[in-house]
Amino acid sequence: MAATILRLSLLTAFFLPTLNMANDRPLTVDDLLALESVGNPQVSPDGQWVAYTISSRDTEEDKRTTQIWMVSSDGGTPIPMTSAGYSASNPRWSPDNKYLSFSASKDEDAKSQVWSLNRLGGEAIQVTNVKQGISGFEWSPDGSRLLLIIQDPKASDLTEDKDDDKKPLPHVIDRMQFKRDYVGYLDRRRRHLYVYTPGSENPTQLTSGDYDDSDPVWSPDGKSIAFVSDRSEDPDLHWGTDVWIVEVDDPDSEIIQVTTNEGRDDSPTWSPDGRSIAYRTATGYDVGGSALTPTRYLASTVIGRDERKILTPELDRNVADPMYSADGKTIYFKLEDSGQVHFASVDKDGRRLIRNLEQQVNVRDFSMAGSKTVLLLGRPDQPAEIYQFNDGTLDQLTNVSNKVLDGVSRASVEKLEFERADGTLVEAFYYRPIDFDSSKRYPTILWLHGGPASQFTYDFSTTGQLYAANGYVVIMPNPRGSVGYGEEFAKGTVAKWGERDFEDVMAAVDYGIELGLVDANRLGVGGWSYGGILTNFVITQTDRFKAAMSGASLGLTTANYGHDHYQLMYELEFGLPWEFPERWVKLSPFSKVQNITTPTLWMGGALDWNVPIINSEQMYIGMKRLGRDTQLVVYPGEHHGIRRPSFEKDRLERWLAWFDERLK
């Protein structure tokens, strides 16, 4: 069905005439591997410095490493704070501004501990020595104590024999939720909160029980800690969380439940006077990342009242990471909206919602302290960097990507909106190839995002830029099921995978043909995770595509029940497989594998328990048995994401080779 345009985005964005000079060269796979990622900005309490992480790929050791850097909040030369010999993460400033603390495991077999480094230099000092390691930490407001997140110990953690860690033991399982990708089989060990005074022998445990505790934040007076936990009768059968408070100096006191809502309450932040807590709330079950994702609102409550006040009731968009201003009058947060993440704010009473940065950028993170605010944001032509934000203006503090991208052409990107036959408005990002000629039509790759509850944004897409650098038009749509367009839109694929979203992505292709960009006879399609799943639904319903790449995707849906880690999601969205067998068959691309004529490359990690490799194996063997053009690539030791640099390179090169051979 042909798509009809209603209107364009604010402008046809980022044609980058100043970046694509005549002697610039195209982006390569090696360029992408050389790119470093900036993350986790933390402004010092006095506002003078910004600590952050830089993650890079060590191609010789074939692994990723992360170091901590800092830069003046007013600009200047960045300073490395940790060495390249080990990975360090989670930077946190001591309240007196003197020390920069972080998490690291310096030895090969060591567990993650808290380390501290004098801001002026010197060697880092190990602060904690927890046998099983720590999962997170935060300094108390007066700097005298540390809040730690520690998982319950296993038997080998309680012995001095290091070989005990290497002795395999049987997995004894009695939980409903018994698997997790990157973790493995789950036992009854949970993550709890502890408080630790540096120099003392052992931390003091604050929370316990058959529950996981997360998102802890100190109260301004340092006497209490707010945290998030699902303390229902069986958390494995319940997809909701509440905000709780525990008293630090009286661990035997009763834990106080702050919120009692049915859905997921998380991301608490204290008001400066300690009387209120703002947090993120959902009005229904929130199965993160799935089609069952309700709108996540900003809310607040006065301690002791159990009265939820939704501060963004008319804003049918997701919020994240709320933070009070120093005077307590304003709450800042990230706001997902129409292919973008804004830096937004609202008065503490829910009045005067403001999008503080009206630019075509994607805000990944922010930090505020003293009088300074910094944003970590990406642009279509530049990976995420750190900027100081002041009254609507941005001053760039880091330029990590420039050493790779200087002299490299980048594709122009525009976001277009078109109307479906039922009146639904759908958006897609269109990447034009380098040296684009408007008189020509180009081979085109339809690239689909994961989730489905996610969205393509005004951010630097390595995939989109790489394909465009190799002569492709790239279409990256936000079909129904995507976030950023309201709850009804996000729930448009509940138990209907491959229906409306299939129609929407095909309409994005048809609109590209109407624009004169797309060669209808040279179409490719691909994606990873739900992007791979939707790819499967595309190629089982149409033969318009000449090549496909399906990564970490779904085959026979019933085979995943109890095999991946989405058991509760399946039950809530699809119903039990023995009660609704027809629905489970309909939602299985494998049941239509005989319809696939598109040459398809199947990929996945051998250890993926998110969307297990059995799915790609099923789809591959079905096509192979039918005599179709297909190939399966399995990456040993990898989970849902491919992290080993040599495998990352292999995957990108295989993508290009597969599409080039069939579309050019």
Locate predicted features.
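Non-catalytic accessory segments flanking enzyme active sites
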Residues: 42, 147-150, 156, 170-174, ...
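Residue-level detector of Asp-centered blade-edge/turn motifs that repeat once per structural unit
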Residues: 45-46, 95-96, 141-142, 220-221, ...
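Hydrophobic beta-strand positions that form the internal "hydrophobic ladder"
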Residues: 47-50, 97-101, 146-147, 225-226, ...
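Short loop/turn segments that connect beta-strands within beta-propeller blades
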Residues: 72-76, 118-122, 197-201, 247-251, ...
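Cap/lid segment of the alpha/beta-hydrolase catalytic domain
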Residues: 285, 400-521, 528, 560-563, ...
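A flexible loop/linker signature enriched in serine peptidases of the S9 family
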Residues: 54-67, 82-88, 103-115, 123, ...
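Active-site-proximal cap/loop segments of hydrolase catalytic domains
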Residues: 477-664
